[in-house]
């Protein structure tokens, strides 16, 4: 394992488990606040397509640690999910970098404003959060390791925010894989038939 200490960029980089991992990379938003991201990429030089997620669950919280019951049920019912991966980097409802990085993708996992390692006030599904995801997409597109093609992939919360940010039409958003995500949270989530669901 090789680790480079945080330097001028303010984040640490290490080679681990066949990946180059950048921890707590700052991504500056249009209002000056810096969100934090973990970037998992193939080792060596080269440009790769990006799979990005941004959400409130904590980018560094392992699936099995934060959601043990759901994790155990998933790997019991579908053992192929855990095959070929240590599951150390698998987080709730996001892609597992140990499966995607060997296929030539960069996985960028961003903590939403006010969540995990990102400062600020958490305001779920707000216009501010949606703009933050837009800026994270555009940031990822221009990094030296990126082809400029950024896709979004995730379940539930990570799917719903895909629909919201897509409405802003980020120039470098080229793909979405939204699983189990309401496209209209008013009708599908909070007010079925116009009646508040509690």
Where are these regions (language model features)?
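N-terminal cap/lid segment of alpha/beta-hydrolase-fold proteins
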Residues: 7-46, 50
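Mature extracytoplasmic enzyme cores
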Residues: 23-24, 28, 36, 107-109, ...
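N-terminal cap/lid subdomain of alpha/beta-hydrolase-fold enzymes
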Residues: 38-105, 110-113, 124, 167
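Alpha/beta-hydrolase active-site loop
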Residues: 91-92, 102, 124-144
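Alpha/beta-hydrolase fold nucleophile elbow
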Residues: 144-157
